[in-house]
């Protein structure tokens, strides 16, 4: 339980964040789908994620009752292209394709707070920070 309450944030170079919900419409409603079906879909969803173990770390925050979205998904990796690959593959699984609602996706470079000023300085370029 402690790991869920206080997740360790990995020291990767890139992060991705997006909010998400499960659909509650008249035609498709995640919460009225029988629990065994939801469990099967989430197991299949998790199997896709496990293929990325070791390259992507995921931290899910529950925000039901605190925000307009039910969850916040944080992904951490040293290669930002892996986010695209993972998200692309997951969009075709049943849980995401039929029931997932996604907000805006944000991808960024992590940097120490002490470097923020130089990143925002005129004349600075990504190359001056080691990016090609």
PLM region spans:
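Generic "edge-of-domain/loop-turn" microfeature
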Residues: 25, 80-82, 111-112
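Short, glycine- and small/hydrophobic-rich beta-strand elements in well-ordered beta-sheets
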Residues: 44-70, 86, 97-112
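Short, well-ordered beta-strand segments in beta-rich or mixed alpha/beta enzyme
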Residues: 15-20, 65-81, 85-90
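Flexible phosphate-binding patches that engage nucleotides and nucleic acids
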Residues: 87, 91-131
């Amino acid at each position: 339980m402690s790991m869920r309450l206080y997740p360790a944030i990995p020291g990767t170079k890139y992060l991705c964040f997006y909010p998400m919900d499960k659909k509650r419409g008249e035609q498709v409603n995640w919460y009225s789908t029988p629990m065994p079906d939801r469990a099967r879909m989430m197991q299949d969803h998790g199997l896709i994620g496990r293929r990325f173990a070791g390259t992507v770390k995921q931290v899910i925050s529950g925000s039901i009752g605190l925000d307009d979205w039910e969850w916040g998904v944080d992904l951490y990796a040293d290669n930002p292209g892996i986010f695209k690959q993972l998200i692309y593959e997951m969009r075709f699984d049943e849980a995401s394709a039929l029931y997932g609602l996604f907000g805006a996706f944000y991808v960024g470079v992590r940097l120490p707070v002490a470097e923020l000023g130089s990143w925002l300085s005129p004349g600075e370029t990504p190359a001056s920070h080691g990016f090609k």
